[in-house]
Swiss-Prot record:
Gene3D superfamilies: 1.10.1420.10, DNA repair protein MutS, domain I, MutS, connector domain, P-loop containing nucleotide triphosphate hydrolases. Disulfide bonds: none annotated. HAMAP family: MutS (MF_00096). ATP binds at G603, P604, N605, M606, A607, G608, K609, S610. GO terms for molecular function: ATP binding; ATP-dependent DNA damage sensor activity; damaged DNA binding; mismatched DNA binding. Belongs to the DNA mismatch repair MutS family. The lineage of its organism: Archaea, Methanobacteriati, Methanobacteriota, Stenosarchaea group, Methanomicrobia. This protein is involved in the repair of mismatches in DNA. It is possible that it carries out the mismatch recognition step. This protein has a weak ATPase activity. GO terms for biological process: mismatch repair. This is DNA mismatch repair protein MutS. It comes from the Archaea. InterPro entries: DNA_mismatch_repair_MutS, DNA_mismatch_repair_MutS-lik_N, DNA_mismatch_repair_MutS/MSH, DNA_mismatch_repair_MutS_C, DNA_mismatch_repair_MutS_clamp, DNA_mismatch_repair_MutS_core, DNA_mismatch_repair_MutS_N, DNA_mismatch_repair_MutS_sf.
Amino acid sequence: MMVRLSPLMEQYSRIKQQCPDALLLFRVGDFYETFGEDAITTSRTLNITLTSRQKDDEGNRIPLAGIPYHSLDVYLSRLVNAGHKVAICEQVEDPKQAKGIVRREITRIVTPGTVIEPALLQERSNNYLAAVLLENGLAGLSLLDLSTGDFIASEVPVERLGSELARFSPAECLAPPGVSLEGMKFQNLDAELFSLNEASESGGILGDLHKRSPLCARAACAILSYLRETRIQSVDHIKPIRMISSSEYMLLDEITLRNLEIFRNLRDGSRSGTLMEILDETVTPMGSRTLARWLQMPSMSLEVIRRRQDAIEEMVRRAVIREEISELLDGLSDLERIIGRVSLGNAGPKDLVALRSSLRRIPEIAHAMSALESEYLVEIRKRLDASELDDLVVLLERALSDDPPTSPRDGGVIRDGYSPELDEIRSALRNGRSWIAELESSERKRTGIKSLKVGYNNVFGYYIEVTKPNLSMVPDDYIRKQTLSNAERFVTRELKEVESRVLSAQERSSALEYEVFLDLRGQVASRTRSVQEVAAAIGELDTILGLTRAALMGAMVRPVVDAGREVILRDSRHPVLDRVMKGGFVPNDLTMDESSWFMILTGPNMAGKSTFMRQVALIAIMAQIGSFVPASYAKIGLIDRIFTRVGARDDLVSGRSTFMVEMSELANILVSATKDSLILLDEIGRGTSTFDGLSIAWAVSEYIHSRIKAKTIFATHYHQLTQLNLPGIVNYSMAVKEEGRSITFLRTVVPGATNKSYGIHVARLAGVPEHVIRRAEELLDIIEEQAAIEIRKCRSKERPKRYTQLIFFNQPESIDNDILEEIKNLEPEKITPLQALNLLVEYRRRLGCKDAKDTHT
């Protein structure tokens, strides 16, 4: 038999059809309830009880799971972090006024990229919603942080899209169907949403982006369309989109960000032990996010770098002013995100109180900066002089009570004296409550019942309670309403009249106060741009102060940054390890100039080669964000990109071996690097046979030297590379102190090569059994002797080249032109591995190789 759904479930079903791909949180009284498959998913994700409601139209029980409305943010955070899209359906009319079922509507659809609630956001990180569009080998990328209003765009070659996404780490990425990128999950949108139709409705947010980059403009339009789909009603706080150019910033790809542990460590993915953690001495959320943006995009502008350095240098000198400003900044609320919530209509009374409290300090901060002279700090001070915000503080002082409740509907939000109409209603309400409060005393006197009490509950309203022993003294005008085990409850006609006036006044007061609050919030929203400008200035000021504190804590110096190609470091230290080791880190020097720009670095495992390379890269990044650096002297020519090939890592999901991953990363470096780049290579070629690896390492070194000419540090155990005799290539090694069978790593980089790796010593330190160690030492002597013989043979077969260096492969004096032509015309992707092997054997036979055999099958 068909079971008819209840009106509530019919309403739920209609609303659920509007968002079939989202979990629907359906407000019912004091709970948000989920039904059906949504309930099963919600119960499993949140680990809450799964129950059931009435039967569906097929007679099956409907699964039900609910959460308390006051705990929404906590549970919403867990659902969104688990990757779910969540639709919030609210009761949009007062149940008391409803005729029939309460009207409900979806008010928000929350996704990872559209969250604005503080509980769902990381305070010190941006939360970007990205959109990507690919065409003709180019990628248009737009990113919006809805919580702050930051809107940026970048057009890059498709092959650089992964690095660009890694740089900004968006919480959610939109793309048309068919777009895919390894390691990135896309939210597919209809291709028609990636059109410029939205541009005319964007209120000037996109500016002339459609002329500068149609791809980015269409991606930005997709974001704005998506906001409408997720029920975002206002875009007034979104800042005009800013196009970023790769020529303005040092490029740091995904691999470099990971290997250098800029934002997340390699151990557990947290910020512990990262460059961001060490430099982040900011005291406000705006400052921390500003620092993160500087690290994401180190500047290529000498002017920008100089201005920041000047500001830090002045703050280092001005200790008293520095501490005064720091105290004023400490405890400031997140102005950027508060004004975002105000503009979006989500801010509550507590947000406005926090805004008021923070804006009060701005004039004090500006005054404390009045004696500062550096160009950047003077500019920041001017940006803090916003008289319009003085008026806003006065408004909030007049309108808001000192300690309002969280919800604007709970009363006590608006201060007496702000709204005459509200004051009048409150006066009537107070008079009524005062009469009721005095009723108990007057009725005790009138009746002589000393235990008489006046009380209130939600069912009967106000009542007079008389204990049973005193019932004989109850006057005739008392009307019995309720009988208890030891008392009776009564009302009087006058009490009910006053109660009616009180409750009516209370309802009118609550409704009017809510309207007044909404009007106040609207007035605050009209100052959004001014608050955003002040918040940005505070973020930059806090970042300068944070970098100043980091410089003082780490005994850092101001680097010389210029347009040259030199990198000169004296007593340089790894910024993270130096802080952790508290002065125990061994400093090192580095000179890279026209005569020594390619360093071959040899030395044992665990001696510090990788650490040294990383510290050079980190110092370069610090220098180009305008920071001081850990050294006694530093001179750094602008670096356009940093490339790192460090450590072993496989990619099992894609079926790529460690060596394949290494070669892919190496290929990217060789294709993308320029003469102004910094390349750090660690153990290239170790994932294959010794001679294959050595050949690759040698060829790579030649290619970088002759073609790219980038500043390079190449750490290797292939000691043969130290024989590269080319201009600009220099040999350095990690110093070791040998005493008998034991060695001590001195962690110092010294001129000259070493021909020992001390791998067996490291094996002994690791606890490898002694008999294995002894056998390894015997074999090492044999293998090294054989290798020396092979190298001597190779040296006698050098080809006539402009290089005077070691050659490992004997070139035939002439190559068969027919074979060469056949190789040129080969299409490798169309032949099988077996066919390739047969071709290789055939070519060797035709070239007259003695060991060539016919293996055709």
